[in-house]
Amino acid sequence: MDDDVFPRPDCLEQLLAYAGYEGVGILAPRRLLEGRIYTNDFLSFNLTRPFSSMYSGRLSKMEVNSPVEISGTAFEGLFVRGEVVRLVGLPNKDLFIFCDDTDYCLRTVAAGYKILYVPTALMDKEKFFSDDSWGKRNKKKKWKRFYQIRNSSYLNHHYGKNWAVKYLRGFNGVIGYILIAFFSAPFSGAYRWTDIPMFWKAYTDGIRERLGRL
């Protein structure tokens, strides 16, 4: 569980109510940010269409009032069965900061287990950088961008079902950050032009599956 989420008193009780459901390997709670539903959980993985997100059927676009089977959730209070850990193993520690949860969900679903989102199991999520400007917020988070680009490029390369997903999806992502850095560097303290080769290295490390913490 991340240190920026706080379970409600009955959160675990609500999760455990579904622990006996057949085939369920992971139970995921509902997170609330300032009292509003906050979710990046999704229904399925897109591993074939390179110009669409890897994450299909986002719950953020749906009204969910009862437990629903999903394919991906965050490492923020999820409940994992012991047999899943014994079969699938531990999360990949080399996927530092980003995508370790997505990778683990992929492996869990591939092993034949279900992931269940339980909307009555509530956790409160803390909001960071709420009063910062765009430049200040991105400057604080910039050190994470390398891992975000690299790890997402790795996921697409490792699990993608065709050449386009393996290479183009990650390329599209890194080009976006390169363009932001190129055009904002003269006017904002968020990025510098020297960040551009770092972003490119993140992409190439990802498709070469070079992981680990720098």
Where are these regions (language model features)?
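Non-catalytic, C-terminal membrane-associated alpha-helical segments of glycosyltransferases
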Residues: 161-214
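The conserved acidic donor/metal-binding loop of glycosyltransferases
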Residues: 2-6
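A short, conserved alpha-helix in the catalytic core of glycosyltransferases
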Residues: 78, 84-89, 94-122
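Alpha-helical elements of Rossmann-like donor-binding domains used by nucleotide-donor carbohydrate transfer enzymes
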Residues: 10, 14, 103-107, 151-154, ...
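A recurrent flexible, glycine/aromatic-enriched loop bordering the glycosyltransferase active site
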Residues: 60-80, 102
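Conserved donor NDP-sugar-binding/catalytic core segment of glycosyltransferases
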Residues: 9-43
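Active-site donor/metal-binding and catalytic loop motifs
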Residues: 118-137
